[in-house]
Structure formats: structure tokens, C-alpha cells
Amino acid sequence: MEERGRRKPLYEMTRELAATARGDLPATLVIRDGTLVSVTSGEVLPGMSVAVRGPRIAYVGPDAGHTVGPQTTVIDAAGRYIAPGFLDGHCHIESSQITVTQFARAVLPLGTTGGFFDAHEITNVLGLRGLRLMLDEARSTPLAAYLEVASCVPSTSTELETPGAVIGPEEVAEALSWGEDVIALGEVMNFPGVVFGDERMHAEISAALRAGKIADGHFCWPPDDHRLAAYAASGISGCHEGTTPEDTLWRLRQGMYAKLRRGSAWHDVAATIKAHTERGLDPRRILLVTDDRSPESLLEEGHMDFVVRHAIAQGVNPVTAFQMATLNPAERFRVSHDVGSVTPGRYADILLLEGDLAEVRVSLTVAAGEVVAEGGRMVAELEPYDYPAFCLDTVRVAGGLGPEDFDIPAPGGGERARVRAIRVVENHVETRGEWVELPVEGGLVRLDPRKDVCKLFVIERHGRGGGRGAGFVTGLGFERPAALASTVAHDSHNLMVLGNSEELMSRAAREVVAARGGVAVAVGGETAVLPLPVAGLMSPEPYEEVARLSREIGRALRSAGCRMNYAFMTISLLALVVLPELHLSDRGLVEVGEEGFRLVGLAAEG
């Protein structure tokens, strides 16, 4: 990892650390007489102490008194556990709708001291400039933040969707040269492309492997046939898209790392962990990850502390659960020499925990040798980041946003139209395709108030051609006139507008454009707005304020009748055309079938 203020590479500190361990140099920090969670040996060891010199650990043992000098800070850990800081094995910071600095403020008090962050949201909007922005800001925080280079920009192809930028093998190779903290090729979402030999996908994977980096995965087909083997044989060695014990089983059998996800809206751990708890699979290649966490869930539930606690509640041994969130991700990403354990030479990313270990109650966080949080609050000040103008003006919508612009012409004649619709699935990333019959009036498809159907539009907002896709979505549960508009619309992040009232769809869309990006929900005469001006994805405001506004979005959706768990996160995937089964882009409806992707019409064929 590049030196980032507080963090120095090990090769610069070997003599200094050895001298501190001998007692010839004083430690800068000593944590005394705690119970060590040794993730490297699998033990829980009482009466242990840790001596730290600068950003790294010099000594771990029963007594660190020989390392204490006049200026050494000594923390008494009696009655508390000493554990390594948590690492998120797969996370999109942008999904929390807060900037990296605010993300660090939110998660450090919860015990997350680092992670492996795939910034493909902002890269789909701003290309390499966006990725570099995230990297530079991450380097200014106490986090051990390792970034992955977005692999699928766009997630499929420009024939199927319009992103704000396009990334190929040359861009991947360039970004991987930016430093050791650019750790991997991000999740290769175009799994059909990999399986069926897409040239761009394989060239990007090759670029990562040539650079000595790893490639991360995203595989959504059933795991027990030749396609997962083809995916793994292409050099992709980890995946977080499993939803069943069999998914975990087969990923491990194919030599991959299985990442078990518990995000705000993706509740997969309860099922996927059974491969370990019920079938006895070795946990050494199992990771716990969040993928996406909303700002209010960070505030109300937690981050990796919540996921570890949840895994323990499913029957995982507490030490094993800690390994899944510390040592295992560090080993998966080949950085266990720096992070993932409380052992000599590693960064001093250390937690003190109170109560029973299974409760995962973090009372103090040390990051790179500095106490950064205590009692659930930051004690270290983080400097605000100065965001450049190019990332604050990214919403460029061509065409109108009046009520009439949300009319959908009827496909064919007659008084009824049989049309495709996308059915959302609560707490899952995939959708289902279905047929619905709707009335036709004046040549336009109208909604039937007796049916749970909304209109759905995806409108290109990057100034790259002005495409506009139209369709229908079911399963939202709206019981009164309502609409939602958002520039958070994975993964191309165009302007998505849905609703059962053209007037309200127009109002919500205009509010989002006026805010320079964000989310708006219009219900009756009220409109809730969450401005996200940084690339149309994130707010630079304090995370507590963003969480408050995000709660208002959730309340507005519930007032309309949409009661799904963290409904916005599920809704934001309606344009993610790389996922099964049916999604909408600015180019139209895209179906993922056994042979890959295809554009399909709105009307019944034949």
C-alpha cells in the first residue's frame, strides 16, 4: 500500500519494529492485559498485551512492560477483548450515498478499519477520473482502503445501455499501476460474457493477472454446471452473489472464495452460511461482506460488526466469524502481511470489545496506531475533502420531463395491451419477468388502478445521446398516486423514473435534476428529496444528515404503500441489465437468459 500519511510500508520499519519488540525503542502505544482474539491460531488468549510503534504492531505477548517509555500511551484493556479491525471483503461505498470521508466517519467507530472497495458506481459516471477521485479521498482517511478497478463499464455493452464512460483493458491496466492499494479487478458482472468468451472481458481479466492482481466475480447462474467452471477457469477467484448453501458449496469446490453477503436489502448470509454450519465446510475461504449498506442502516444497525454478529447468530463460532471478517479477506486479497490480524509487523488496526464476544460491542478503534474512535464516536478529526467541479455537474438530461413525456404508446391496436413487466423480489438482486394486461386509451397504455403496476422509465443523463427506455414494474405495492426519480440507477446510473401518476413522475424527475442528482419521492402534494450532487450518487454532507434524508425517502415510499425492506435499494437495481431476469435501460428492456443478453420488446411477440 502506498504511504498515506499515517501508514508506512513494512520495508521502511523493520529495524524500528524489531528494536521496539526488544525494548530498545519505546512503543508509541501499548494495549495492556486484554483477552486477545487470535485469528491466526483460532484461540482466545487472556492476559495479552500489544505494543505499537507508529502505524504498526511491534510486539504481542503476555507482558509489554519492557516497551513502555515516558511518552508511551498505555490503554488498560482488562475485561475487554483485543481483536483485529474488521475488513469488508466487498463493498461499494457509493451505495451508502455518502463520500469516502463520511463513510470513514460512519464505520470506524463500528470497528471497520478497512476493506476492498469496488468503485464501479462512480466509474460508470465519470470513468477513471471518478475512480481516481475515490482513491485520492480514501488515501486521506485512516482506513486501510484497497480499491478495485471497475471491470464492467458499462455492465454489458453500449448496445444495451449508455454509461457516462467506457472502460476497457487499457484503462484497467493504467489504473492497476496507480499503487499497491489498487488491489484487484472489480467484480466481473458480465458473467455471460466471460463464460461465452467476450473479448473485452477476457482482455481485462488478463490485464489484471498480468499485473499480478486478482479478479473478483459476480456469477448469478446455477452453480452446478459447466458455466461456473468456465467462469473460474477464466481467472476469477471470488464471488459474492451466492444466495443458497449450494452456491457456497460449489464456489469453494471450484477453488473460489465464497463471499457471504448481508447488506441492507440483500439477506443472503442466513442461507449461504449453512454450507459451513450444517454441512461442515472449511471456513478458511469464506468471507463476510456487505456489498451495499444504506446510510440509515449504517447508523441504526451497523456495518461489519452487524454482519459478524448476524453470522454468530446463525451458529458460527465467534472466532470463526471474526476470521471471516479479518484474516480471510486479507488472505484472499494477498495483504495479510499488512492487515487482518493482531500480530507483529501488521498495521495496528485494533479493536477493543466489551461484554460477550458474540455481542460484538466495539468500544475503541485504533487505525494505523492511532485511537480514532471511542464509545461509538470519532475522536479523530477528518479533514473535509475538496470535490472538483467535474464531479458536481453530471446530470445532463436531453428531452422533456413533462407529464406527457411519461406516456407509453400502445403496441398495436385494440382496447387492451399485453406487455412485459419487471417484478421486483424483496431482499434479492434478481427480478422476474412477467406479462400484464393493461387498458389502452387514445393509443396510450394506461395503468389499471386495481393492479400493482407502475410505469418505469430510464432516461440517459450523461449527455451521450439521450436514449429513453420505457416499461412497467410490478410488486412495489403502491396504494395511492406516487412516483420516484433517481440518478442512482445501477449501474449506468441514468435517470430512472417510476410511478403510477405522470404528474408526479414529472415532479419527481424535475426535483432530481434541480438537485444535480439524487432521489425524490412524490406522494400526493408532498415531495421528499435526497440531493446527491457528487456524480449524482453521493452527498458530501455529514452521514447523519444523509441518513435522515434517506429515512424520509423510505417513509415516503411506505406512505405510498411500498413496504419492502429498504425498498430504495431494491428499486435502484431495476436498471441493472446484467442481472437476471428482466431489467430496463435507456435502450429498452434487456433479458438475461441461458445464452446471455438480448433486447426484448414491450409487447407480446406474435
UniProtKB/Swiss-Prot annotation:
Q: What protein does this entry describe?
A: Adenine deaminase
- Which family is this protein grouped under? Belongs to the metallo-dependent hydrolases superfamily. Adenine deaminase family.
Q: What class of enzyme is it?
A: hydrolase
The molecular function terms in GO held by this entry are: adenine deaminase activity
The record's listing under HAMAP family reads: Adenine_deamin
Q: Which residue windows are transmembrane per the record? A: none
Q: Which SUPFAM superfamilies match?
A: Composite domain of metallo-dependent hydrolases, Metallo-dependent hydrolases
**One of the GO biological process terms:** adenine catabolic process
Look up keyword GTP-binding and say if it applies.
no
Task: Report keywords, A-Z.
Answer: Hydrolase, Manganese
User: EC number(s) per UniProt?
Assistant: 3.5.4.2
Coiled-coil stretches, from where to where? none
Checking InterPro entries in the record gives: Adenine_deam, Adenine_deam_C, Amidohydro-rel, Metal-dep_hydrolase_composite, Metal_Hydrolase
Taxonomic source organism:
Rubrobacter xylanophilus (strain DSM 9941 / JCM 11954 / NBRC 16129 / PRD-1)
Recorded catalytic reaction(s): these are:
adenine + H2O + H(+) = hypoxanthine + NH4(+)
Q: Which cofactor does it need?
A: Mn(2+)
**What Gene3D superfamilies does the annotation carry?**
Metal-dependent hydrolases (3.20.20.140), Urease, subunit C, domain 1 (2.30.40.10)
